[in-house]
Amino acid sequence: MFYQLNNNMTNKPTIAAIIPAAGVGSRMQHNAPKQYIKLAGKTILEHTLTKLSALAQLNTIVVALNENDPYFEQLPVIDARIVRTCGGKERADSVLNSLLFLAANPPDWVLVHDAARPLVTIDDINTLINECISADEGGILASKVKDTIKRGHIYAEQTVPRDDLWQALTPQFFKYEDLKNALQNALASGAVITDEASAIEWANKPVKLIPGRSDNIKITTPEDLDLAGFLLQKQQNENAL
Protein backbone atom coordinates (compact mmCIF):
# COMPACT_ATOMS: atom_id res chain seq x y z
CA MET A 1 0.00 0.00 0.00
CA PHE A 2 1.37 3.45 -0.88
CA TYR A 3 1.47 6.09 1.77
CA GLN A 4 3.44 9.22 2.54
CA LEU A 5 4.43 10.64 5.88
CA ASN A 6 3.31 14.22 6.27
CA ASN A 7 5.96 16.38 7.91
CA ASN A 8 4.39 19.64 6.74
CA MET A 9 7.86 21.03 6.00
CA THR A 10 8.38 21.85 9.69
CA ASN A 11 11.18 21.03 12.07
CA LYS A 12 8.92 18.87 14.20
CA PRO A 13 10.15 15.27 14.36
CA THR A 14 8.05 12.80 12.41
CA ILE A 15 6.56 9.93 14.39
CA ALA A 16 5.03 6.65 13.23
CA ALA A 17 3.15 4.27 15.49
CA ILE A 18 3.45 0.50 15.14
CA ILE A 19 0.94 -1.97 16.55
CA PRO A 20 2.07 -5.61 16.35
CA ALA A 21 -1.20 -7.53 16.04
CA ALA A 22 -0.32 -10.79 14.30
CA GLY A 23 -0.64 -13.02 17.37
CA VAL A 24 -3.43 -15.48 18.05
CA GLY A 25 -3.73 -15.03 21.83
CA SER A 26 -4.25 -18.72 22.63
CA ARG A 27 -4.48 -18.07 26.38
CA MET A 28 -7.76 -16.22 25.84
CA GLN A 29 -9.47 -19.52 24.90
CA HIS A 30 -11.45 -17.77 22.16
CA ASN A 31 -12.07 -18.53 18.49
CA ALA A 32 -10.82 -15.14 17.31
CA PRO A 33 -7.43 -13.61 18.15
CA LYS A 34 -7.61 -11.65 21.39
CA GLN A 35 -7.34 -8.25 19.68
CA TYR A 36 -10.72 -8.93 18.05
CA ILE A 37 -12.56 -9.87 21.23
CA LYS A 38 -15.24 -7.37 22.21
CA LEU A 39 -14.71 -5.03 25.15
CA ALA A 40 -17.64 -2.73 25.95
CA GLY A 41 -19.11 -3.17 22.47
CA LYS A 42 -15.92 -2.69 20.44
CA THR A 43 -13.00 -4.95 19.68
CA ILE A 44 -9.89 -4.49 21.79
CA LEU A 45 -8.01 -3.40 18.67
CA GLU A 46 -10.63 -0.74 17.91
CA HIS A 47 -10.17 0.73 21.38
CA THR A 48 -6.40 0.78 20.92
CA LEU A 49 -6.57 2.33 17.44
CA THR A 50 -9.05 4.95 18.63
CA LYS A 51 -6.69 5.91 21.44
CA LEU A 52 -3.70 6.30 19.12
CA SER A 53 -5.79 8.15 16.54
CA ALA A 54 -6.31 10.90 19.11
CA LEU A 55 -2.60 11.75 18.86
CA ALA A 56 -2.24 14.46 16.21
CA GLN A 57 1.55 14.17 16.22
CA LEU A 58 1.46 10.68 14.67
CA ASN A 59 2.05 10.75 10.92
CA THR A 60 1.01 7.17 10.29
CA ILE A 61 -0.16 4.14 12.29
CA VAL A 62 1.06 0.78 11.01
CA VAL A 63 -0.79 -2.35 12.11
CA ALA A 64 1.18 -5.58 11.60
CA LEU A 65 -1.29 -8.40 10.96
CA ASN A 66 -1.25 -12.09 10.23
CA GLU A 67 -1.11 -12.55 6.47
CA ASN A 68 -4.44 -14.41 6.53
CA ASP A 69 -6.19 -12.10 8.99
CA PRO A 70 -9.89 -12.02 7.94
CA TYR A 71 -11.05 -9.64 10.68
CA PHE A 72 -9.24 -6.34 10.22
CA GLU A 73 -11.01 -5.25 7.04
CA GLN A 74 -14.35 -5.74 8.81
CA LEU A 75 -13.53 -3.03 11.34
CA PRO A 76 -14.89 0.47 10.78
CA VAL A 77 -12.44 2.98 9.32
CA ILE A 78 -11.15 4.86 12.34
CA ASP A 79 -8.45 7.08 10.85
CA ALA A 80 -7.00 7.59 7.37
CA ARG A 81 -3.48 7.35 8.84
CA ILE A 82 -3.95 3.65 9.63
CA VAL A 83 -2.29 1.21 7.23
CA ARG A 84 -1.63 -2.52 7.46
CA THR A 85 1.38 -4.67 6.75
CA CYS A 86 2.28 -8.32 7.27
CA GLY A 87 3.38 -9.38 10.70
CA GLY A 88 5.83 -12.12 11.55
CA LYS A 89 6.07 -15.25 13.66
CA GLU A 90 7.09 -13.37 16.80
CA ARG A 91 6.43 -9.86 18.07
CA ALA A 92 9.97 -8.74 17.19
CA ASP A 93 9.49 -9.99 13.63
CA SER A 94 6.25 -8.02 13.29
CA VAL A 95 7.88 -4.85 14.55
CA LEU A 96 10.86 -5.28 12.23
CA ASN A 97 8.55 -5.93 9.26
CA SER A 98 6.73 -2.70 10.11
CA LEU A 99 9.99 -0.77 10.33
CA LEU A 100 11.03 -2.09 6.92
CA PHE A 101 7.59 -1.17 5.57
CA LEU A 102 8.34 2.40 6.64
CA ALA A 103 11.86 2.39 5.19
CA ALA A 104 11.02 4.15 1.91
CA ASN A 105 10.10 7.28 3.86
CA PRO A 106 11.27 6.66 7.42
CA PRO A 107 10.04 8.69 10.38
CA ASP A 108 12.40 10.14 12.96
CA TRP A 109 10.82 8.19 15.82
CA VAL A 110 8.58 5.15 16.24
CA LEU A 111 6.04 4.47 18.96
CA VAL A 112 5.39 0.74 19.42
CA HIS A 113 2.26 -0.24 21.35
CA ASP A 114 0.63 -3.56 22.18
CA ALA A 115 -2.69 -4.16 20.44
CA ALA A 116 -3.97 -5.65 23.69
CA ARG A 117 -3.31 -2.54 25.83
CA PRO A 118 -6.39 -0.42 25.11
CA LEU A 119 -6.31 1.38 28.47
CA VAL A 120 -3.17 3.44 27.99
CA THR A 121 -3.91 7.13 28.55
CA ILE A 122 -3.18 9.98 26.17
CA ASP A 123 -1.43 11.82 29.02
CA ASP A 124 0.99 8.93 29.55
CA ILE A 125 1.77 8.68 25.83
CA ASN A 126 2.39 12.42 25.55
CA THR A 127 4.65 12.35 28.60
CA LEU A 128 6.67 9.51 27.07
CA ILE A 129 7.03 11.25 23.71
CA ASN A 130 7.88 14.65 25.17
CA GLU A 131 10.44 13.38 27.68
CA CYS A 132 12.22 11.19 25.15
CA ILE A 133 12.39 13.84 22.45
CA SER A 134 13.56 16.41 25.00
CA ALA A 135 16.33 14.06 26.20
CA ASP A 136 17.06 12.83 22.66
CA GLU A 137 16.89 9.27 24.03
CA GLY A 138 14.45 6.41 23.64
CA GLY A 139 12.32 5.18 26.50
CA ILE A 140 9.36 3.14 27.65
CA LEU A 141 6.39 3.49 29.92
CA ALA A 142 7.00 1.37 33.00
CA SER A 143 5.51 0.73 36.42
CA LYS A 144 7.44 0.15 39.64
CA VAL A 145 7.03 -3.42 40.90
CA LYS A 146 4.90 -3.36 44.06
CA ASP A 147 4.55 -7.06 44.86
CA THR A 148 7.13 -9.27 46.51
CA ILE A 149 8.89 -11.24 43.77
CA LYS A 150 10.03 -14.84 44.27
CA ARG A 151 12.46 -16.83 42.14
CA GLY A 152 11.84 -20.58 41.96
CA HIS A 153 10.09 -23.45 40.27
CA ILE A 154 7.73 -25.57 42.37
CA TYR A 155 9.14 -24.04 45.56
CA ALA A 156 10.32 -20.52 46.31
CA GLU A 157 14.10 -20.38 46.23
CA GLN A 158 14.80 -16.69 46.64
CA THR A 159 13.08 -13.37 47.28
CA VAL A 160 14.22 -10.86 44.68
CA PRO A 161 14.90 -7.29 45.89
CA ARG A 162 12.39 -5.06 44.14
CA ASP A 163 13.90 -1.62 44.77
CA ASP A 164 15.11 -1.31 41.19
CA LEU A 165 12.55 -3.56 39.47
CA TRP A 166 10.14 -2.14 36.91
CA GLN A 167 7.36 -3.75 34.90
CA ALA A 168 7.81 -2.82 31.25
CA LEU A 169 4.65 -1.43 29.63
CA THR A 170 3.94 0.02 26.21
CA PRO A 171 4.15 2.26 24.28
CA GLN A 172 7.90 2.05 23.79
CA PHE A 173 9.43 4.98 21.91
CA PHE A 174 12.73 4.99 20.04
CA LYS A 175 14.48 6.61 17.12
CA TYR A 176 13.63 4.78 13.92
CA GLU A 177 17.19 3.99 12.87
CA ASP A 178 18.24 2.92 16.37
CA LEU A 179 15.38 0.46 16.70
CA LYS A 180 15.64 -0.91 13.16
CA ASN A 181 19.38 -1.53 13.46
CA ALA A 182 19.09 -2.98 16.96
CA LEU A 183 16.32 -5.40 15.98
CA GLN A 184 18.02 -6.52 12.79
CA ASN A 185 21.34 -7.18 14.51
CA ALA A 186 19.88 -8.75 17.65
CA LEU A 187 17.65 -11.14 15.71
CA ALA A 188 20.49 -12.06 13.36
CA SER A 189 22.61 -12.95 16.40
CA GLY A 190 19.92 -15.23 17.81
CA ALA A 191 19.21 -13.00 20.81
CA VAL A 192 15.85 -13.44 22.54
CA ILE A 193 13.97 -10.17 22.09
CA THR A 194 10.80 -9.84 24.16
CA ASP A 195 10.18 -6.13 23.60
CA GLU A 196 11.74 -3.22 21.77
CA ALA A 197 13.66 -2.08 24.84
CA SER A 198 15.44 -5.44 25.06
CA ALA A 199 16.77 -4.92 21.52
CA ILE A 200 17.97 -1.42 22.39
CA GLU A 201 19.58 -2.77 25.57
CA TRP A 202 21.27 -5.48 23.48
CA ALA A 203 22.73 -2.67 21.35
CA ASN A 204 24.08 -0.98 24.52
CA LYS A 205 21.93 2.11 24.10
CA PRO A 206 20.05 3.83 26.95
CA VAL A 207 16.38 3.22 27.67
CA LYS A 208 14.61 5.83 29.80
CA LEU A 209 12.02 4.53 32.27
CA ILE A 210 8.99 6.82 32.26
CA PRO A 211 6.50 6.06 35.07
CA GLY A 212 3.13 5.06 33.63
CA ARG A 213 -0.25 4.23 35.09
CA SER A 214 -0.62 0.73 36.47
CA ASP A 215 -4.07 0.36 34.87
CA ASN A 216 -2.36 0.15 31.46
CA ILE A 217 -2.79 -3.63 31.56
CA LYS A 218 -2.21 -6.12 28.76
CA ILE A 219 -5.27 -8.27 28.11
CA THR A 220 -3.97 -11.84 27.97
CA THR A 221 -6.46 -14.03 29.87
CA PRO A 222 -10.26 -14.08 30.34
CA GLU A 223 -9.71 -12.63 33.82
CA ASP A 224 -7.84 -9.70 32.27
CA LEU A 225 -10.84 -9.00 30.03
CA ASP A 226 -13.12 -8.70 33.05
CA LEU A 227 -10.65 -6.37 34.78
CA ALA A 228 -10.25 -4.29 31.62
CA GLY A 229 -14.01 -3.77 31.44
CA PHE A 230 -14.01 -2.43 35.00
CA LEU A 231 -10.98 -0.20 34.40
CA LEU A 232 -12.40 1.15 31.14
CA GLN A 233 -15.60 2.19 32.89
CA LYS A 234 -13.54 3.81 35.65
CA GLN A 235 -11.50 5.79 33.12
CA GLN A 236 -14.64 6.90 31.30
CA ASN A 237 -16.12 8.10 34.59
CA GLU A 238 -12.91 10.03 35.36
CA ASN A 239 -12.99 11.71 31.96
CA ALA A 240 -16.64 12.67 32.44
CA LEU A 241 -15.87 14.65 35.60
Curated annotation (Swiss-Prot):
InterPro entries named among the record's database cross-references: IspD (IPR001228), IspD/TarI (IPR034683), IspD/TarI_cytidylyltransf_bact (IPR050088), ISPD_synthase_CS (IPR018294), Nucleotide-diphossugar_trans (IPR029044)
Keywords from the named record: Isoprene biosynthesis, Nucleotidyltransferase, Transferase
Site (Positions MEP for the nucleophilic attack): 162, 218
Keyword hit for Nucleotidyltransferase: yes
Gene Ontology molecular functions: 2-C-methyl-D-erythritol 4-phosphate cytidylyltransferase activity
Site (Transition state stabilizer): 27, 34
Catalysed transformations (reactions): 2-C-methyl-D-erythritol 4-phosphate + CTP + H(+) = 4-CDP-2-C-methyl-D-erythritol + diphosphate
Protein name, UniProt field: 2-C-methyl-D-erythritol 4-phosphate cytidylyltransferase
The species this protein was found in: Pseudoalteromonas translucida (strain TAC 125)
